[in-house]
């Protein structure tokens, strides 16, 4: 991705985007199939997303460049989506 003449790899958001898509799909599948174990797995997956966010925050605070900032911003939105998958999973567990 090119931003203001700089080439950005957006490595953290690229890495986590696949996990977040898996979480969203998994939470929907858990709901449709009334699958508590799948719901629990979604909750566990969130730890990886959160840890990646903390790592990216640490790196962005030290590098302060446009690419790190953009990667962090996208990652924060992805982390929020992952949190919604966790909320769905938690409701499934309570419902069943």
What are these regions (language model features)?
Residues 1-96:
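Cytosolic, long alpha-helical scaffolding segments
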């Amino acid at each position: 991705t090119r931003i203001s003449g700089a080439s950005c790899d957006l490595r953290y958001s690229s890495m986590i985007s696949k996990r977040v898509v898996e979480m969203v799909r998994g939470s929907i599948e858990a709901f449709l199939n009334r699958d508590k174990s799948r719901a629990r797995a979604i909750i566990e997956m969130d730890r990886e997303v959160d840890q990646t966010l903390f790592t990216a925050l640490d790196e962005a605070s030290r590098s302060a460049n446009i690419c790190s900032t953009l990667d962090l911003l996208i990652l924060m939105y992805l982390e929020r989506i992952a949190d919604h998958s966790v909320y769905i999973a938690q409701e499934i567990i309570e419902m069943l």
